[in-house]
Design a protein with these regions (language model features):
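C-terminal amphipathic/interface module of NAD(P)-dependent oxidoreductases
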Residues: 174, 190-225
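Conserved Rossmann-fold NAD(P)-dependent oxidoreductase catalytic core, especially the SDR/UDP-sugar
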Residues: 8, 29-63
Length: 225
């Protein structure tokens, strides 16, 4: 069983913490219990970390800054109780969704289609990855019967500003407008500034390495992102 459903944004979890806990923690506990005798993969997040150091490994202690991160960290502990189960921490995933408004990359395209400018942080760092690469990695982990904790993310640490520039280069006809900003000045929930993930552990067991976003975009010029 692969469990990737969630209240999946910081803002949504912060505005409705009870729902976030029911979906992210309680539902995970229920599903993990139902899957007690079979392999179970739970999708977690780089936002279980506080972002003070970056390049986090699987052995680093979590320290979430907000309700979303807290619920993911709590759910991880439930899944870890069963040695047959697996936790996959990932980062920003890009691609296309059924609704067209699920991912960071889709938010950018929608803004540009509406001729709106976008303010992107130069001081917040993640390891973005194409969702198809995440799916490939998880499928390989399942087929190899890997259990425990794995970081599955892009091989390149980028700021949101850098990510936006890479994506904008693909959508020049939309006349992308990007301005730099600072996460430390953001008035909303606290933001972890550098949750980049060290992916050495998973790279050592995959048939092909996970690429960085720049590398992936160059190798897949016609793939929507």
């Amino acid at each position: 069983m692969i469990h990737c459903a969630a209240v999946s944004t910081v803002a949504a979890a912060q505005s409705n913490p009870d729902l976030a806990r029911r979906v992210n923690v309680d539902a995970t506990a229920l599903l993990a219990g139902l899957a007690a005798d079979i392999p179970f993969v739970f999708f977690s997040s780089d936002l279980v970390f506080d972002g003070r150091k970056g390049n986090y490994t699987e052995t680093d202690a979590v320290n979430p800054l907000h309700i979303y991160g807290e619920t993911k960290a709590a759910a991880e502990q439930i899944v870890f109780k069963n040695s047959r189960h697996t936790v996959v921490r990932t980062s920003l995933n890009g691609g296309t969704s059924r609704t067209g408004n699920r991912g960071f990359n889709e938010d950018l395209r929608l803004a540009w289609q509406a001729d709106r400018g976008v303010n992107l942080f130069t001081d917040e760092f993640r390891c973005p990855i194409f969702a198809g690469e995440t799916a490939r990695a998880v499928w390989e982990l399942v087929n190899q019967r890997r259990t425990g904790l794995f970081h599955v993310a892009g091989a390149e640490k980028l700021s949101r500003w850098q990510i936006g520039q890479l994506i904008a280069a693909r959508w020049l006809r939309l006349n992308p407008k990007i301005t730099p900003g600072l996460a430390k000045n953001f008035p909303g929930p606290p933001r972890a500034l550098d949750t980049s993930l060290n992916i050495t552990k998973v790279q050592n067991v995959l048939s092909a390495p996970l690429p960085g976003l720049g590398e992936w975009l160059a190798a897949n010029p016609n793939e929507p992102f």
